[in-house]
């Protein structure tokens, strides 16, 4: 029997480009919607710059609070499970890049720079070979700030056609397509 193939760690990164001072319903909902995806497909979930109330100073407290305020994700059960497994991560907005333990930064966008554009199979090969990846999604109508496009060495358009998707639809599409592609690559190797 062959040992299980070790892949890189995959992380959904949610970057707050809404209001950085006031916590909004959209913040709570996107975490509640992304957590079941992370749990189902064995990804991490990292949030950056969310203005949680000050008393929510740990991921466990954030998960508990979200689970008490939503019916999404089996009433927040998956958010709590992610946190219990150390896979819900809460960070301030990064000032000098993203935490290296999350992996290589990949910008998700419908407008990738041509020279940095990657396909789902490119990302799947990298993850299947052991590279950890942080796939970053911008929240709000403007998406990710342009300065993040500079530091993201890879840009990924899940549609491959420049089509705009609602944030949670994009997250589900990225997680599903990349997880499936990795699974197929690993099946081919075994």
What are these regions (language model features)?
Residues 42, 102-103, 131, 151-153:
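Short, well-ordered alpha-helix to beta-strand connector turns
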Residues 3-6, 98-99, 125-129, 148-149:
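Solvent-exposed alpha-helices and their adjacent loops that cap or buttress functional pockets
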Residues 18-20, 52-55, 112-115, 140-144, ...:
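Short acidic, S/G/P-rich loop/turn micro-motifs used as interaction or catalytic elements
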Residues 109-148:
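Long, charge-patterned amphipathic alpha-helical coiled-coil/hairpin "stalk" segments used as oligomerization
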Residues 1-5, 187-190:
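Short, Lys/Arg-enriched, disordered terminal segments
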Residues 2-110, 176-180:
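RNA substrate-binding interface of SAM-dependent RNA methyltransferases
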Residues 27, 60-62, 120-123, 149-152:
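Short, glycine/charged-enriched secondary-structure capping and boundary segments
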Residues 143-190:
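Structured adenosyl-cofactor binding patch, chiefly the S-adenosyl-L-methionine
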């Amino acid at each position: 029997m062959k040992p299980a193939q070790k892949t890189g760690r995959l992380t959904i990164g949610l970057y707050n480009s809404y209001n950085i001072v006031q916590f909004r319903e959209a913040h709570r909902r996107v975490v509640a919607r992304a957590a079941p995806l992370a749990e189902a497909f064995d990804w991490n979930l990292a949030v950056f710059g969310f203005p949680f109330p000050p008393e929510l100073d740990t991921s466990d407290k954030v998960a508990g609070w979200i689970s008490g305020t939503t019916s999404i994700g089996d009433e927040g059960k998956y958010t709590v499970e992610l946190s219990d497994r150390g896979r819900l991560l809460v960070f301030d907005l990064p000032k000098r890049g993203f935490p290296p333990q999350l992996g290589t930064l990949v910008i998700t966008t419908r407008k990738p720079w041509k020279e940095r554009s990657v396909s789902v199979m490119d990302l799947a090969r990298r993850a299947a070979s052991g590279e950890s990846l942080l796939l970053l999604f911008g929240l709000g109508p403007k998406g990710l700030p342009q300065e993040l496009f500079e530091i993201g060495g890879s840009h990924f358009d899940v549609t491959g056609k420049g089509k705009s998707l609602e944030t949670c639809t994009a997250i589900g599409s990225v997680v599903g397509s990349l997880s499936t592609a990795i699974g197929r690559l690993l099946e081919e190797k075994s």
